[in-house]
Amino acid sequence: MSRLVVDVTGRGEPLVLVHGLATTGAIWRRVTPSLARSRSVASIDVPGFGGSDPAGRGFDLDAVAQRIREGLARAGVAEPYDLVGHSMGGALALTLAAAHPEAVRGLVLVSPAGLAPVPGALAAAVGRAAELYIPLRRYGAPLAGHPWGRRLLMTGGVIDGAALAPAEVRQLVCSSRGARRTREALVAVAAADLRAMLAELQRPVGAIIGSGDRVVRPGTLDTIRALRPDAACEAVADAGHISMIERPRRFVTALERVLVAIS
């Protein structure tokens, strides 16, 4: 039986958190304590990342989403749950919700991938570039002690990496060592077009994006609103792509607002 790491804390209605590329469920650690005051919060390591076994060869969104649902069930996470997905995790969360709407009460997309597809050749090129960048990030932990090093290591993730604590950046970088399916996942989500899936989803939808996000396209919130006029949308001020790390309090406030709006 394949292993899915599921870390559950708190009591209340179930809330599932799905992380993005090149990291693990630890990406949520700055917001989990606040969320767990009123919720049972389950953060996972996506199959092929952290301590979770891959879902077969490569990275198939449907297969990975299915493995996530099965692993949550084995861990005793009750359905239906509110499902939150960040970046790659947004594409996976949407895929899971579309395949198994009975398992999901509401869906929250945080700076989601899968809504602005790129051509397959470009996606493959991005994947090859990741093969160079990810090792640098994995073994660049000593650079976190310098402001310029934190900026380099967190390029694209936050507005100013130097503003993060060295220990925070070091932990994020080290978590990349367990991201075994990063290249395959990057190619899969870059080429994915899940817009029709989102438009047709028979579940309430919310979205959160950092005001300074440089990874997802600037018009992503507009795209979501066009596809889902009923979506509850929030922007996290002064935050980039990893808003839950850069502005944890603001992120929690935004997420709680969205969850109330879609409940």
Regions flagged by a language model, labelled:
Residues 141-200:
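Conserved alpha/beta-hydrolase catalytic His-Asp/Glu region
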Residues 9, 33, 42-85, 98, ...:
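Active-site loop/oxyanion-hole signature of alpha/beta-hydrolase fold enzymes
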Residues 98, 105-138:
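Flexible "cap/lid" loop of the alpha/beta hydrolase fold
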Residues 239-252:
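Catalytic histidine-centered segment of alpha/beta-hydrolase-like enzymes
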